[in-house]
C-alpha cells in the first residue's frame, strides 16, 4: 500500500472528516525542499478523498512569525524590522530596500510560491495566521494558555528537556515599535496582557487582536485545536523526540483540542550538497525548478519515496533516470495477480499509488502526461531542432504524434528547452552535430571501423529514411564488415558527435538530412 493510502486508512479511524494541513514561514524565497511537506500533505488529502472520506487541505502561512535577521537579499535598513511580524513588514524592492507600495513582506514571498503550487496541481485553502489572530480566533486559546501557564511550562520542560527562563510567559506581546523582541509581560487582565518594552515604554495588548502571538510550541498546538487539524506532516526537526510535535500533543489536549496523527518526513537534499536552505544559498526556487521539470516528474520524486526516507533532488543527469522510471511505470503499470506473494502485492499497490498521486489532477490519465514521447527522445529533438514546429513535424514522421501536440507535450518541450539552455543540464547529454570529422575523433577510428563506415555510407543512399530501417542498415553493415554492434555505434558517435557516446544512434541519424549524414560518414 502506498504511504499516502496507508495514512488515509489510519486517519479513517478518527472519523469521516479530515483536515490535512501544511504550513510555511514566508521569510524568504521558497525552495523545492519546502515541497516535501506540501506534497506529502496534499497527497494524503487526495488519498483521503480516494478512500471515500471528506477532506480539506489547508495551507497555514506563519505570517505572524517575526523577521529573525537581515538576510543577504535585504538592505541593512531592515534591521529596524527585526522582531516584527512578517505581515506587518513592507516587501523588499529590487534594491532590497523596503517598498511601501509592494504589499507585505509575507505576501511578497508567498505569491510566487502559490503560483508554483498551482502548476503541480496543488490549490490549498490558504489561511494567513495573522488574520486568525486578528479576527479573535486565538483569543480563547491564549486565555487558556495563560490560565494554564504552569502546566504548559511543565510540559515543555519535561518533554523537551530544556529549562525555560523564570519570567517565561505563554504569550509574546508586540512592543511600542511593533516588535516581539525585548518585551516583558507585567500582568494579565483579560483581554489585556500588560507589558513594558526595551525602551521602557508600558502598554497593553488585546488578545482578541493581532497585538501579540503565542510562542511557537503553543501556537502550533492552538491552531490544531482551532482548525480541527487531523493530520499535519512535520519535518524531522519538529518530529524528533522532545521536539515541538511531542510538546504540541499534550498542549493541544490541554487547550481542549484533539491533536493530529504524528507523521514525520525526511528532508530533500540537493544532490552532492546538504539539506536545502534559503539562508545558506543551497536552494532551487520552485519557479526555477518548474521551468525545467515536468510537474508529474516533480510530484513523482515525492510520491515514490516513503516520508521517512530522505530525497536527493537532482536537476542534472538523474532527471533522465527519474523520467525513464516514471515513463516505464506509466507505459506498463503493474497489476495484481492471484499467485503473487503478499510482498509483491504491496509493491504493486505502492507503485500504482505513486503513479496515481503524481498526476496534476485526480482524474488525469497518466499516459497524457507523457504525450507519447519519451523524455530522452524529446531532449534530443529539442537540441537538434531549432523551432517547435520542426519538432512536431519530426514526431509526426516518426509516428510519435498524429495531429497537433497535446498541451502537456507542448509544456514538456518548453521546459526541456529551458533545461537545455540553463545551468542544470548535464554536460554529457549535450548534443552538437559535427559538420566534419575532427582530428581527435578521426584518430580513434581504426581500419575495421573505416570499412564499416564506407559500406554504411553506400547503403544509406538507398535505405528507407526512418529509425527502424536505418537501425537495421547499421546492424547489417556492421555484421557484414565483421564489426560488433558496440564498436559500430562508437564509430558513428565519433563521426557525428565527436565523442564515443550519445542518444539512440538510429533515432539521431533519422533526424539528420540524408545527404549531410552520408557526406560526413563517407569523409572518414
Predicted feature residues:
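N-terminal Rossmann-like or analogous alpha/beta NTP/dinucleotide-binding catalytic cores
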Residues: 1-153, 248-249, 255
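Basic, alpha-helical terminal appendages of large translation-related enzymes
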Residues: 1-15, 29-30, 56-58, 153, ...
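Active-site cores that bind ATP or allylic diphosphates and position pyrophosphate for catalysis
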Residues: 118, 122-286
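Short amphipathic alpha-helical segments and their helix-coil junctions
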Residues: 124, 228-229, 285, 346-365, ...
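Catalytic adenosine-cofactor/nucleotide-binding cores of aminoacyl-tRNA synthetases and other
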Residues: 240-245, 266-421, 497-524
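A short glycine/serine-rich beta->alpha loop
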Residues: 24-32, 231-237, 476-481
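A generic secondary-structure signal for well-formed alpha-helical elements
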Residues: 45-48, 52, 117-124, 149-156, ...
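Short, histidine-centered active-site or binding-site loop motifs used for metal coordination
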Residues: 21-26, 230, 305, 460
Amino acid at each position: 500500500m502506498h504511504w499516502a493510502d496507508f495514512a488515509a486508512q489510519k486517519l479513517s479511524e478518527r472519523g469521516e472528516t479530515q483536515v490535512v494541513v501544511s504550513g510555511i514561514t514566508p521569510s524568504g524565497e521558497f525552495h523545492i525542499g519546502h515541497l516535501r511537506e506540501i506534497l506529502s500533505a496534499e497527497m494524503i488529502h487526495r488519498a483521503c478523498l480516494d478512500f471515500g472520506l471528506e477532506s480539506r487541505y489547508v495551507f497555514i502561512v506563519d505570517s505572524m512569525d517575526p523577521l529573525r535577521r537581515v538576510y543577504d537579499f535585504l538592505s541593512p535598513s531592515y534591521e529596524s524590522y527585526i522582531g516584527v511580524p512578517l505581515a506587518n513588514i513592507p516587501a523588499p524592492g529590487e534594491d532590497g530596500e523596503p517598498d511601501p507600495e509592494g504589499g507585505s513582506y509575507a505576501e511578497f514571498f508567498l505569491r510566487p510560491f502559490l503560483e508554483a503550487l498551482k502548476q503541480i496541481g496543488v490549490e490549498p485553502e490558504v489561511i494567513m495566521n495573522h488574520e486568525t489572530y486578528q479576527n479573535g480566533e486565538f483569543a480563547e486559546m491564549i486565555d487558556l494558555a495563560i490560565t494554564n501557564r504552569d502546566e504548559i511550562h511543565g510540559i515543555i520542560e519535561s518533554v523537551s528537556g530544556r529549562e525555560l527562563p523564570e519570567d517565561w510567559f505563554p504569550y509574546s506581546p508586540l512592543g511600542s515599535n511593533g516588535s516581539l523582541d525585548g518585551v516583558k509581560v507585567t500582568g494579565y487582565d483579560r483581554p489585556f496582557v500588560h507589558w513594558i518594552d526595551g525602551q521602557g515604554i508600558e502598554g497593553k495588548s488585546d488578545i482578541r487582536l493581532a497585538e501579540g502571538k503565542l510562542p511557537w510550541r503553543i501556537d502550533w498546538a492552538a491552531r490544531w485545536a482551532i482548525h480541527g487539524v487531523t493530520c499535519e506532516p512535520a519535518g524531522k526537526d519538529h518530529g524528533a523526540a522532545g521536539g515541538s510535535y511531542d510538546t504540541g500533543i499534550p498542549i493541544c489536549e490541554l487547550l481542549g483540542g484533539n491533536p493530529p496523527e504524528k507523521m514525520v518526513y525526511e528532508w530533500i537534499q540537493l544532490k552532492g550538497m546538504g539539506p536545502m536552505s534559503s539562508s545558506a544559498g543551497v536552494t532551487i526556487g520552485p519557479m526555477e525548478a518548474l521551468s525545467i521539470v515536468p510537474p508529474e516528474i516533480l510530484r513523482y520524486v515525492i510520491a515514490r519515496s516513503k516520508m521517512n526516507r530522505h530525497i536527493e533532488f537532482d536537476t542534472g543527469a538523474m532527471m533522465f533516470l527519474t523520467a525513464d522510471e516514471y515513463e516505464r511505470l506509466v507505459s506498463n503499470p503493474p497489476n495484481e495477480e492471484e499467485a503473487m506473494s503478499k510482498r509483491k502485492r504491496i509493491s504493486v499497490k505502492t507503485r500504482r499509488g505513486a503513479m496515481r498521486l503524481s498526476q496534476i489532477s485526480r482524474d488525469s490519465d497518466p499516459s497524457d502526461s507523457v504525450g507519447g514521447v519519451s523524455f530522452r527522445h524529446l531532449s534530443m529533438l529539442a537540441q537538434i531542432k531549432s523551432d517547435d514546429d520542426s519538432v512536431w513535424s519530426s514526431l509526426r514522421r516518426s509516428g510519435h504524434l498524429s495531429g497537433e501536440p497535446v498541451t502537456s507535450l507542448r509544456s514538456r518541450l518548453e521546459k526541456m528547452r529551458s533545461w537545455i539552455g540553463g545551468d542544470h543540464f548535464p554536460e554529457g547529454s549535450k548534443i552538437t552535430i559535427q559538420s566534419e570529422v575532427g582530428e581527435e575523433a578521426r584518430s580513434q577510428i581504426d581500419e575495421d571501423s573505416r570499412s564499416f563506415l564506407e559500406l554504411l555510407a553506400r547503403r544509406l543512399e538507398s535505405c528507407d529514411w526512418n529509425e527502424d530501417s536505418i537501425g537495421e542498415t547499421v546492424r547489417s553493415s556492421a555484421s557484414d564488415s565483421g564489426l560488433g554492434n558496440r564498436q559500430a555505434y562508437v564509430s558513428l558517435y565519433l563521426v557525428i558527435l565527436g565523442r564515443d557516446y550519445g542518444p539512440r544512434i538510429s533515432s539521431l541519424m533519422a533526424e539528420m538530412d540524408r545527404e549531410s549524414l552520408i557526406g560526413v560518414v563517407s569523409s572518414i
